[in-house]
């Protein structure tokens, strides 16, 4: 279980304190109350209602068809089940195209029970992050492989190799300067993600970004070894195989994140 007092709900300031104290953060996606309740009870610190639901729940080939209404529905379902974990919800594709649109979508998500919203990218998104934070809405940034940009990237590919790594470091500092309280790094080479994590004052959560991040996240279907209908990424590990039950898998995943045994080199990307 988490070293954060089991009866004490996670808060945004507590995340930063965990980083200062060197305590790894455990995050999983969830899309309904049943799984969310199990994850919350067995050591998960943060729950992400991700727009990944478009692929693993709705059966689409990308996250692009997901709407704000979809996100609000699933966020509300998950929120009803949580006692401890901090709830993060994605802004869906183009919901953050302008600060005003982002505020409308974020307001709906917070009213549904989210405690933080996640925004992909930097660039013009810095204005959106600042706009939301100035209006008391906590923001998690998402850099590296940002699935909403899959068309521009030409597929799901590792980001931040070579000179792109320095740009990623600059973007990471920029989103924190804009007010982000948390940063997800996806499909980033381990050395770059480790350096970014050392650079920043806020926690980093890795997914395919190596063990040097301040925490880890997986899509729940991947953590449980379920067939999502898509190619299995390198960074995925089936914890149900060793855990024996959903609760056991969650405990095994949480322990592996906290003791640093996951991810190992087999589940990460070199420079």
From Swiss-Prot:
Catalysed reactions, semicolon-separated: 3-methyl-2-oxobutanoate + (6R)-5,10-methylene-5,6,7,8-tetrahydrofolate + H2O = 2-dehydropantoate + (6S)-5,6,7,8-tetrahydrofolate
Matching InterPro entries: Pantoate_hydroxy_MeTrfase, Pyrv/PenolPyrv_kinase-like_dom, Pyrv_kinase-like_dom_sf
UniProt KW keywords: Cytoplasm, Magnesium, Metal-binding, Pantothenate biosynthesis, Transferase
GO molecular function terms attached to this record: 3-methyl-2-oxobutanoate hydroxymethyltransferase activity; magnesium ion binding
UniProt KW Oxidoreductase keyword: no
Compartment(s) of residence: Cytoplasm
Binding residues for 3-methyl-2-oxobutanoate: 51-52, 90, 118
Example of a GO biological process term: pantothenate biosynthetic process
SUPFAM superfamilies: Phosphoenolpyruvate/pyruvate domain (SSF51621)
Residue stretches spanning the membrane: none
Cofactor or coenzyme needed: Mg(2+)
Textual note on the cofactor: Binds 1 Mg(2+) ion per subunit.
E.C. numbers: 2.1.2.11
Primary localisation category: cytoplasm
Protein's name in the database: 3-methyl-2-oxobutanoate hydroxymethyltransferase
Organism: Xanthomonas euvesicatoria pv. vesicatoria (strain 85-10)
Gene behind the chain: panB
């Amino acid at each position: 279980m988490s070293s954060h007092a089991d009866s004490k709900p996670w808060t945004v300031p507590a995340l930063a304190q965990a980083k200062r104290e060197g305590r790894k953060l455990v995050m999983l996606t969830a899309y309904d109350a049943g799984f969310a309740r199990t994850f919350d009870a067995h050591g998960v610190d943060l729950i992400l209602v991700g727009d990944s639901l478009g692929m693993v729940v709705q059966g689409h080939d990308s996250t692009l068809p997901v709407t704000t209404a979809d996100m609000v529905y699933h966020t509300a379902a998950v929120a009803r089940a949580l006692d401890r974990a901090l709830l993060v919800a994605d802004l869906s594709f183009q919901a953050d195209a302008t600060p005003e649109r982002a505020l409308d979508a974020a307001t709906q998500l917070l009213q549904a029970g989210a405690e933080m919203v996640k925004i992909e990218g930097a660039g013009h998104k810095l204005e959106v992050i600042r706009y939301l934070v100035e209006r008391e809405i906590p923001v998690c940034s998402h850099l590296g492989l940002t699935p909403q940009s899959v068309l521009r990237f030409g597929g799901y590919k590792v980001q931040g190799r070579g000179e792109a790594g320095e740009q990623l470091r600059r973007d990471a500092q920029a989103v924190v300067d804009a007010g982000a309280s948390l940063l997800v790094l996806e499909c980033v080479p381990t050395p770059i993600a480790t350096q970014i994590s050392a650079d920043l004052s806020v926690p980093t959560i890795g997914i395919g970004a190596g063990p040097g991040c301040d925490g880890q996240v997986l899509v729940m279907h991947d953590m449980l070894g379920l067939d999502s209908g898509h190619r299995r990424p390198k960074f995925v590990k089936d914890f149900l195989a060793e855990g024996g039950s959903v609760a056991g898998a969650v405990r095994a995943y949480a322990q592996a994140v906290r003791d640093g045994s996951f991810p190992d080199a087999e589940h990460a990307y070199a420079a």
